[in-house]
């Protein structure tokens, strides 16, 4: 009797790859290492993913959707910014992949030539909707504010992930961040 394909193998491969990334970054992520960690063989990995970039792209999409879900669960744009920062702080390796590789994996001419399909920008789309719910007008009206917020949130996330802010100063930095986001939303900074 022939073996039946495992319908969850792709998910197992991605889980294994994400764990490898978390432990060792890009150097740890080889097709052979992924296969071993997933409990399968290398040809099985190649049947589901063309190459390492294809696996990274799938992990990246997961991360993008996880961050978007965190922002979506927020009751306000302010809370959405806080949740984004929380995700970056509690998942530094995933956030590292998110900020370092998004353009290269989804939007660069090289990745598009290799068959990558731009996957939208789920975090931006959720935040744009949150801004529209709070401030009214059309979503396109909030482009400059959204850009300004993204710069502040990403900058704060980078400082926390890189451990540039001393642990003793983290609470004060968080208060500054919260106040700055509130001020930007109140004053329409960036519009």
What are the roles of these predicted feature ranges?
Residues 1-7, 19, 191:
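N-terminal intrinsically disordered/low-complexity leader segments
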Residues 27-28, 137-140:
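Short, charged helix-capping/linker segments at alpha-helix termini
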Residues 32-36, 45:
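Append "Primarily bacterial transcriptional regulators
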Residues 7-18, 22, 27-28, 39, ...:
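An amphipathic alpha-helix adjacent to DNA-recognition modules
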Residues 107-136, 143-148, 171, 175-186:
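Amphipathic alpha-helical packing segments from all-alpha helical-bundle domains
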Residues 90-111, 125, 158-166:
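Amphipathic alpha-helical segments used for helix-helix packing
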Residues 150-168, 183-191:
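Amphipathic C-terminal alpha-helical segment
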Residues 58, 69-96, 122, 145-149:
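Hydrophobic alpha-helical connector segments
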């Amino acid at each position: 009797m022939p073996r039946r394909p495992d319908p969850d193998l792709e998910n197992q491969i991605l889980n294994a790859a994400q764990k490898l990334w978390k432990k060792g970054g890009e150097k740890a992520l080889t097709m052979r290492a992924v296969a071993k960690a997933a409990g399968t063989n290398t040809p099985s990995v190649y049947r589901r993913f063309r190459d390492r970039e294809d696996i990274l792209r799938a992990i990246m999409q997961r991360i993008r959707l996880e961050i978007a879900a965190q922002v979506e669960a927020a009751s306000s744009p302010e809370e959405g910014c806080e949740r984004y920062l929380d995700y970056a702080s509690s998942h530094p390796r995933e956030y590292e992949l998110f900020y370092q590789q998004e353009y290269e994996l989804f939007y660069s001419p090289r990745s598009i030539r290799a068959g990558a399909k731009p996957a939208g920008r789920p975090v931006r789309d959720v935040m744009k909707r949150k801004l529209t719910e709070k401030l009214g007008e059309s979503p396109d009206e909030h482009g400059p504010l959204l850009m300004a917020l993204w710069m502040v949130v990403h900058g704060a996330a980078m400082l926390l992930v890189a451990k540039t802010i001393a642990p003793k100063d983290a609470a004060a930095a968080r208060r500054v961040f919260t106040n700055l986001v509130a001020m930007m939303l109140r004053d329409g900074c960036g519009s």
